[in-house]
Structures are given as structure tokens and as C-alpha cells.
Design a protein with these regions (language model features):
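Conserved AMP-binding/adenylate-forming core of the ANL superfamily
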Residues: 1-25, 32-38, 42-46, 63-68, ...
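Conserved AMP-binding A3 loop
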Residues: 8-11, 130-157
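ATP-dependent adenylate-forming carboxylate-activation enzymes
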Residues: 15-18, 35-36, 56-71, 83-85, ...
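Conserved ATP-dependent adenylate/AMP-binding module captured primarily in the ANL superfamily
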Residues: 21, 60-91, 155-174
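Short hydrophobic alpha-helices that are characteristic scaffold elements of the AMP-binding
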Residues: 45-51, 57, 73, 181, ...
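ANL superfamily adenylate-forming
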Residues: 84-126
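Conserved pre-ATP/AMP-binding loop-to-beta segment of ANL
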Residues: 116-134, 141, 166-172
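Conserved AMP-binding/adenylation subdomain of ANL enzymes
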Residues: 153-172, 179-204
């Protein structure tokens, strides 16, 4: 649910498949998601998993230097951007001297209704690295923390099991915080989606 529309799971999957047509397809390909919270952010993120890639969420308020550092460290194949972050991303790519491809999520918004790709789900091995989160810690430059699907599934099970049924098909979760942080990413997006519950996207 967004301030302007309600999106079904079928519509979400259709949009993810559309975005996946532009996301790098090779297994373990790294792709940055550099944008403010939006439904396009969600489609971009899950399209990376659709193609068995590794997602790297980055703070939408990051500076050119911040993004250039992550680009140089992670060497991603592509970076999803919004209209607000595109210029910063392009300057960072030039500064880092990498060949990362810029993908504009705004260009795909509203096109999914015409997508005719075959319906396929997201498949993975528990040991596959699925996301790299850059965290600054207390000193020095941010460190890229690699998480596997098993890491996420353990957390999801802990809050969605019969013993602790925080998320279920009848629950609704409000996404308030930026999704590049692990807590909102897992706790307000991935876990509710895996539990087939409703998420409500707060405008940022």
C-alpha cells in the first residue's frame, strides 16, 4: 500500500519480473539500489534476487565520495537510481573509474501492465550471499557486511513462527525507516513479504 495506490502480490511480482529484465542476470552479480524508499525501490531490490544476484542497498542521501567508495570497494555491475540520485551516481562512477551501468527505476514505473514475461518465483540456496550492507561502525570507512539467505531466514523465522507470530497473512507493517538499514529492510519489508502480509510504504 502506498499513499496513492494498493498493489497486489500478483502486480508486485509482475513489476519485479519487468525490472529483472534490466538487472544483470549472471548469478552473484552485484547491483546497488541507490534511491529513496518507493515501490520502485522494492521492485529493484527483489529483481536482483529474481536474477540470483547480490543486492547492495545504499543510503539515498550519500555523497559522491560515499558512493564512489562503495563502487570502488564492491565493483557492482549495475546501480539502480531514481531521478533524485542519478546525478550523484554518475559523478561517483566517474570518480571511482568503474564501468557500472546506471539503471533508472523511474523509467520503468507504470510499464509492468504491458509486461509478458513468464511467471517465475525467486529461487535460492541457503548459502547464497543475497545482500551486502555497508556499515560504518565506529571508525574508518564503511565495511561491506555479507548476509546469506540463511542469515535472513533465521531472523524471519524467529518473528514469524507459531511461537512468535509477529507476521502473518492478516498483519500490516508500516515502512518508516530508510530501507538501506538492516532492521527496516528485514523487519518491515522482507519478513512481511515472505509472510505474505501487507506492507504500507510511508512517503519519504
Amino acid at each position: 500500500v502506498t499513499p496513492t495506490e494498493e498493489i497486489s502480490y500478483a502486480e508486485m511480482l509482475e513489476n519485479i519480473r519487468l525490472f529483472a529484465r534490466y538487472t544483470p542476470e549472471q548469478k552473484e552479480a552485484k547491483t546497488i539500489v541507490f534511491a529513496e524508499n518507493s515501490v520502485e525501490w522494492i521492485y529493484s531490490f527483489f529483481s536482483i534476487w529474481q536474477n540470483k544476484g547480490i543486492a547492495i542497498p545504499v543510503d539515498a542521501s550519500s555523497t559522491v565520495d560515499d558512493v564512489a567508495y562503495i563502487l570502488n570497494d564492491a565493483r557492482p555491475e549495475a546501480i539502480w537510481v531514481s531521478g533524485q540520485t542519478e546525478e550523484t551516481a554518475r559523478q561517483a562512477i566517474e570518480k571511482a573509474g568503474v564501468d557500472t551501468v546506471v539503471l533508472r527505476m523511474d523509467d520503468l514505473s507504470g510499464l509492468a501492465a504491458h509486461d509478458e514475461t513468464k511467471e517465475t518465483g525467486i529461487s535460492f540456496e541457503d548459502s547464497d550471499v543475497c545482500v551486502i550492507l555497508y556499515t560504518s561502525g565506529t571508525t574508518g570507512f564503511p565495511k561491506g557486511v555479507m548476509l546469506t539467505f540463511k542469515n535472513l531466514l533465521v531472523n524471519i523465522d524467529a518473528i514469524s513462527s507459531k511461537e512468535v507470530p509477529i507476521f502473518n497473512k492478516n498483519s500490516s507493517t508500516l515502512i518508516l525507516l530508510p530501507l538501506h538499514h538492516v532492521m527496516p529492510l528485514v523487519g518491515t519489508l522482507v519478513a512481511p513479504i515472505f509472510s505474505e502480509s501487507q506492507v504500507v510504504l510511508c512517503p519519504t
